[in-house]
């Protein structure tokens, strides 16, 4: 039995019951999940691969898990796509991407192999490798690695050269990957190929100028509206005021692409999410032209899942990206709306003190609150609540900020529980859209100007939702339960 066959057999024999897991967020069948990989359209269906270690709920020698969807919301688990079974990827099949070609579904990933230096020091070499398949089964090409580390200019790190993102443009294929320069600062390198197997180095698309963390992971480069966007995840990034508190952060650099010199002229850099659990996002372009992003809904530094839980890791809900008036907006894909049931819609509801509203409770919800007017100074929403537990968002009017608190969510270890997000764009009204799915919350502020993503593993018996206002607030409320066929919250 091959390594891949053994892993697939283990996955089938140890698959975890779906009722123990979120309803519409991707989780591993069993074991560990991290970065999304190969987010792509193939033969009209959405494919998502992911960093996967089925044998434990902690990170190990990485495989590629695989799932498929027709609408971004209902996902079907497929057999494991890649195993670390060759010399060039024996230490792991690290992150990468996918593209549809005439030859089939092409996966471009980082193969990690152990290496011993002349002085006996053990290290690794990271190189880019190719596999081609039919949407279910994939075969690695005999020419691997197709982008060997030797193609990098002198002084560029061969140990940190990973996470290729591929696209096709003007009949050629292009790839960006994360790398380190001679000063050990992060940079994104750009390569070109005509046939996917023979690649040449073009340029440093952009580097971090010693400002934005160290190694840059999981780059993704695309046009959006009239701009170009580089999504990247810097490691060891310093906090700046109320920005960049995760250490391992995800940012977007927006600017103009100098195609002649293969260089991104950056105009603005923004945090992609202000929560505790968001990393390594990747995007695709849909057949109707939308740019959709998904990310790992967890953090390397804040693993809080219960000890008895045999799966570890989730993905965010896929989000549509748009740039309007130089602002990057993120919102849940529209496909979520077809699964909304049991509506509760209230207009100009007056909230004073603490209250629970009939029909508004549960842990699998799409809930929007729009604060219209009032003399209040603070407005708080508590969710996943009972007499013992709660998670909350509090809007503080004087500071134009939102405070998150999961201190009382029932965690078993001491991690970051509180965080404050300063509002970037203030409006006459404040709109808060919460997507809840058992063990996570994704907050979209003012139609997606800012987002805040966090996990919590509170007992599912805690399902109350409580609104609290220090004085009086006039609000609109729109609540839906999210229900897939046969799902249970």
Where are these regions (language model features)?
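Beta-rich carbohydrate-recognition and catalytic domains
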Residues: 1-163, 168-211, 223-274, 297-347, ...
């Amino acid at each position: 039995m091959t390594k891949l066959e053994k892993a697939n057999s283990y996955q089938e024999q140890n698959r975890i019951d779906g009722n123990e897991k979120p309803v519409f967020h991707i989780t591993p069948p069993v074991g560990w999940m991290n970065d999304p990989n190969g987010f792509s359209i193939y033969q009209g269906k959405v494919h998502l691969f992911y960093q996967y270690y089925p044998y434990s709920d902690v990170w190990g020698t990485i495989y590629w898990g695989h799932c498929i969807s027709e609408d971004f919301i209902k996902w079907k688990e497929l057999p494991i796509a890649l195993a670390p079974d060759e010399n060039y990827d024996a230490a792991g099949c690290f992150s990468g991407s996918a593209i549809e070609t005439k030859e089939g579904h092409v996966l471009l990933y980082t193969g990690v192999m152990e290496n011993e230096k002349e002085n006996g020091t053990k290290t690794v070499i990271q190189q880019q490798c190719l596999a081609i398949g039919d949407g279910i089964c994939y075969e690695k090409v005999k020419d691997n690695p197709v982008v060997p580390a030797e193609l990098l200019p002198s002084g560029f790190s061969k140990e940190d050269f990973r996470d290729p993102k591929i696209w096709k443009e003007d009949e050629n294929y292009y790839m960006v990957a994360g790398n380190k320069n001679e000063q050990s600062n992060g940079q994104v390198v750009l390569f070109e190929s005509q046939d996917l197997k023979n690649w040449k180095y073009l340029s440093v698309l952009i580097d971090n100028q010693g400002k934005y963390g160290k190694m840059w992971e999981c780059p993704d480069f695309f046009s959006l509206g009239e701009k170009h966007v580089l999504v990247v995840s810097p490691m060891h990034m310093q906090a700046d005021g109320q920005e960049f508190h995760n250490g391992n952060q995800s940012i977007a650099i927006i600017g103009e692409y100098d195609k002649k010199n293969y260089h991104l002229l950056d105009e603005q850099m923004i945090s992609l999410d202000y929560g505790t659990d968001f990393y390594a996002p990747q995007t695709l372009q849909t057949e109707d032209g939308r740019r959709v992003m998904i990310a790992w809904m967890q953090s390397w530094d804040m693993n809080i899942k219960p000890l008895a839980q045999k799966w570890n890791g989730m993905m965010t809900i896929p989000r549509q990206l748009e740039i309007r008036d130089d602002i990057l907006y993120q919102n849940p894909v529209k496909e979520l709306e077809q699964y909304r049931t049991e509506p509760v819609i209230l207009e100009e509801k007056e909230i004073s003190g603490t209250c629970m509203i009939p029909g508004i409770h549960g842990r699998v919800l799409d809930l929007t609150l729009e604060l219209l007017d009032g003399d209040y100074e603070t407005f708080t929403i508590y969710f996943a609540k009972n007499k013992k537990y709660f998670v909350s968002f509090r809007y503080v009017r004087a500071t134009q900020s939102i405070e998150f608190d999961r201190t009382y969510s029932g965690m078993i270890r001491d991690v970051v529980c509180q965080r404050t997000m300063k509002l970037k764009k203030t409006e006459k009204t404040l709109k808060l859209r919460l997507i809840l799915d058992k063990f996570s919350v994704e907050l979209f502020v003012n139609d997606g100007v800012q987002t805040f993503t966090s996990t919590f593993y509170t007992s599912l018996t805690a399902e109350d939702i409580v609104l609290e206002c220090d004085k009086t607030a006039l609000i609109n409320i729109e609540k839906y339960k999210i229900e897939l066929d046969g799902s249970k919250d």
